[in-house]
From Swiss-Prot:
Coiled coil: none annotated. It holds the Pfam family JAB. GO terms for biological process: formation of cytoplasmic translation initiation complex; translational initiation. It comes from Caenorhabditis briggsae. One of its GO terms (molecular function) is metallopeptidase activity. Belongs to the eIF-3 subunit H family. HAMAP family: eIF3h (MF_03007). It is found in: Cytoplasm. The keyword tRNA-binding does not apply. Residues 276-295 are annotated as: Disordered. One of its GO terms (cellular component) is eukaryotic 48S preinitiation complex. Component of the eukaryotic translation initiation factor 3 (eIF-3) complex, which is involved in protein synthesis of a specialized repertoire of mRNAs and, together with other initiation factors, stimulates binding of mRNA and methionyl-tRNAi to the 40S ribosome. The eIF-3 complex specifically targets and initiates translation of a subset of mRNAs involved in cell proliferation. The keyword Cytoplasm applies. This is Eukaryotic translation initiation factor 3 subunit H.
Length: 365
């Protein structure tokens, strides 16, 4: 990810997503979740997006997609297994794009999609993939699909791309605290979200309108299933993931605090030694002696942040924690609303029962 690339500001402002793409993503992810493939492999469901870019309208139109090859577990100790997997993945991707072109389907790659529960799962590998795709085309995006919300009746597909500042740091592969601070990069502006408009065919729109107007169509509006609080497991899972991220952030804060103290101590020591050396050189020049070099002071090793990727992991953990908190907040607010509605309905039923009892007693008298 340290390859020097030219950073081009993207011009796309919104995304037009075909309903066929939504159906294929949902079917792909749900089939793998039902089979347990994601839990066994440990990888997220992923695929490639194809479509067209309309610069005059600042619109990215995603018209089709296809899944990518999964990384199969290596049974034997084969050193070339990873390379063979990448070659197989690239070959199958090219074959699929060639078939798209033959069938007169849009074959221009405009990004990729992945599934992450609760919309949180941004990792170092995902950032590398986003950088590679945006380096290939500045308009490329990633679609993050949340299967948990979809199973709860709310389709969740969000489009993201790296901001210009994040792309600059990713091209240098340098996430030191000084560079992150000078770029003004935080977890809130590291990624840019684009609005999505889902496009359906005209026949589908007509069918939905006819179903809504049809008297024989039962909407089940009096069903009590809308009051079910069926989010206990997902809420518990999101809270546990949030707690794990907070623990990692606490460790990172301790490392960053130690690094800040060591860096300040190092800068003060270098400044003090430089001042003394300059005064000593002035005295030597006054006596006619040659000045002493500053090389030994410059060779003093500066402290390093004890993390593998600088502040990148901290930024991603903060972003995931924020996504998990938003999910928990949405679920709890919906559950509280359902509880209030159920309580009001129960009280109304009790009052109605009492009124009917009083009226029957008065009539018998």
């Amino acid at each position: 990810m340290s390859t020097a690339v030219t950073i081009t500001a993207p011009s796309v402002k919104h995304i037009l997503l075909d309903s066929l793409v939504v159906m294929k993503i949902v079917k792909h992810v749900d089939s793998e979740l039902h089979a347990g493939i994601s839990e066994v492999s440990g990888d997220a469901c992923a695929g490639v997006l194809t479509g067209l870019v309309f610069l005059e309208d600042s619109r990215l139109e995603i018209t089709n997609c296809f899944p990518t090859v999964r990384n199969e577990p290596v049974i034997d100790d084969d050193a070339n297994a990873a390379q063979q997997y990448e070659e197989q993945k690239q070959q199958e991707m090219l074959d699929m794009l060639r078939k798209f072109r033959t069938m007169n389907i849009d074959y221009e790659i405009v990004g990729f999609y992945q599934s992450h529960q609760f919309g949180a799962g941004f990792s170092h590998d995902l950032v590398e993939s986003m950088f590679d795709y945006q380096a290939m085309g500045p308009e490329n995006v990633v679609l993050i699909y949340d299967p948990i919300k979809t199973r709860q009746g709310q389709l969740s597909i969000r489009a993201w791309r790296l901001s210009t500042a994040a792309l600059d740091l990713a091209s240098k592969n340098d996430w030191r605290p000084e560079l992150v601070k000078s770029a003004g990069l935080t977890y809130q502006n590291m990624f840019e979200e684009l609005p999505i408009i889902i496009k359906s065919s005209y026949l589908n729109n007509v069918l939905m309108s006819e179903l809504a107007l049809s008297k024989s169509y039962s909407s089940d509006k009096y069903s009590t299933r809308h009051f079910d609080l069926g989010s206990k497991k997902s809420l518990e899972k999101s809270v546990r993931a949030m707690m794990a991220n907070v623990d990692e952030l606490n460790k990172s804060i301790q490392s960053l605090t130690k690094y800040t103290i060591d860096k300040q101590r190092h800068d003060n020591m270098v400044f003090s030694l430089t001042q003394k050396r300059q005064q000593e050189n002035e005295s030597r020049l006054a006596r006619g002696d040659p000045p002493l070099p500053m090389d030994d002071i410059k060779r003093i090793k500066a402290p390093q942040l004890q993390t593998r990727n600088g502040l990148l992991d901290e930024l991603l953990a903060s972003f995931d924690t924020n996504a998990l908190a938003d999910f928990s907040k949405t679920v709890t607010s919906e559950n509280i609303t359902k509880l209030f509605i159920a309580e009001a309905v129960a009280e109304e039923k009790v009052v109605g029962t009492k009124d009917r009892t009083l009226s029957s007693v008065s009539s018998t008298r």
